[in-house]
Amino acid sequence: MQKKDNQTIRFCKKCLYSSQHPLGIVIDINGICSGCKIHEEKDTINWSKKWLELKKITKNYKLKKQNFYDCIIPVTGANDSFFTVHVVKNLLKMNPLLVCYNKYWNTPLGIKNLSTLRIKFNCDIIFQNVNPIKVKKITKATLYKLGSIYWHSLSGHSVFPVQISIKYKIPLIIWGAHQGLEQVGMYSHHDNVEMTRRYRKDHDLMGIEAENLISSSDNLTESDVFQYFYPDDYELNKVGTRGIYLGNFIRWDVKKQHEEMIKHYDYKTCKTNRTIDCYDYVDSFNYMNLHDRIKLYKHGFSKITDQLCREIRFNRIDRNSALKTAKLYEKKKSLYEKNFCEWLNIDQKSLNYLLDSFKNKDFWKQIDVTKWKFEGLSHLNKKVEIIKKNSKLKYIQNSKIKLDAKYITYGKGIKDF
């Protein structure tokens, strides 16, 4: 527990999250957070019954389909895409249409995984390639306004499937896990929460939809951002668009699921500099690097903390070891920033200066003009020493990304920046 500006910041006694979590978290009188409490449902729910609920939902869409596709699955070259397609195609026996938003910071590994996904599961896929000039304008605007380089990616990935649902009249969209449920216990598994525009705006997009960007930037016009507009309620109701999450019906365990996909479908993984997890976000040069550095600045924790909280809850690592591991990784160098600066046409010093302005004063203390002291949980506890070796958690690394690798921007041809 620490005090900042007359407010108390509390930390969960079981995991590493604080009461300042951007998704909102509740820590009870016993010091246990809502994320840890909801996670306990995974061991008490009758998952066989939940699976039957899912089969009943999807059966209705198979019987009522108006075209060749039973549903839509948003995919990338990483994360839960392989497992989600596996469940839908092989276990639920549905014929999905895959949709993918081009993030433009694609790694060779992500391109390989995306190709493998299409081939192994024999699925049709549609890509959305927004003009890279527009993507750069949007990224520069959100970087200056929100301290976010990932707004365009989060917006595109979450709206493109909905647009395709309207265009092709495919009502059902199937997602993997719900982030708010998994991380902070925003909902119970029993709520069967579904995709909403409100959650997308408030959390994925940091309260700023595409329309808001136009009014808050002198450099953006409607023609720059129209591809990120969410369909209106009339269109959604006409088609009956809804998005469900498999994590409500399956005992969601990302590490276990990834290892199944590695074994059966040759999912490619690699080590990144700022975490022990080799499985998440291997498709992006920036997510586990610059984006993760920004996350540490703004929220006082990075992706390694998300992953360690998850592993604590699955009893694969104890809290003290997790805290030591977080301290080892969370401030490691962010790689490939030169690529980003060249892509966006800004210099590194200007980027660093801008990002300093977004540092959360609850977790960062300014010593002088260029020097800051981090005061997150791992650095507040003086008893926590940096461990020389990684935790006992084991991950399968079957590939590598070279340090001099460049973005693969398949939208308008492949070009080295």
Indicate residue ranges for each PLM-predicted region.
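Nucleotide-activated chemistry modules centered on ATP-dependent adenylation/adenylyltransferase
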Residues: 1-71, 87-373, 380-417
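Short, glycine-rich nucleotide/cofactor-binding loops
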Residues: 71-80
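Hydrophobic positions on the alpha1 helix immediately C-terminal to the Walker A/P-loop
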Residues: 83-84
